[in-house]
């Protein structure tokens, strides 16, 4: 598929009716690091037990399969276009970002094209940073682990909001108009409240990690 955000691989695994999705990524780490993520046919993270079995096989240094037994690889064109359209239709059709100025920090990573493009197509004025990947500068002094540059850009450009992704675009930080980082639990709470007011929060339930503040339960 080529360089893609991790969520795009999740979506495309199901969309293309594949049996398995594989993402090569070190997430928010520097370029020297690397890792691998697996998705099942529904685009969901595979079961932990299966991950452990795969790790065991790798540690045991299983014999390599000869190339002739592997089949062949082919590239599918315009997968980014497919994911772009999917991402856009998750936004209500009556919602426009017109008149909103957004700083988008893409961490010199996989979303360096797609995030600014989607925001502009939704009507926003976009100030892009971290959009010049060279294979070595991913997550370097930018993105969700180093939001200071984006915070400064929000103030310098009188932006309404800042969005910081990590290298593979599966985590996000928000910056308010004053250049301050938005607390993730508060963001979840605000979204939940908005959906409750529209009677669109399924079962009036929010799913959060164990790291989230218990105040969300109130």
Model-identified regions with their sequence ranges:
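Hydrophobic "anchor" residues on beta-strands that sit immediately upstream
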Residues: 101, 162, 205
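Active-site flanking residues adjacent to catalytic metal/cofactor-binding acidic residues
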Residues: 24, 104-107, 165-167, 208
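Proline/glycine-rich low-complexity loops and linkers
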Residues: 52-85, 89, 178-218
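Short Gly/Thr/Asp-enriched flexible loops that form oxyanion-binding sites at enzyme active sites
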Residues: 32-41, 114-116, 170-190, 216-217
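Gly/Ser/Thr-enriched, mixed-charge loops and adjacent short helices
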Residues: 34-157
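N-terminal small/polar loop signature for handling phosphorylated ligands or for N-terminal nucleophile
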Residues: 1-33, 117-175
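Short, well-ordered alpha-helical microsegments
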Residues: 6-10, 111-112, 214-217
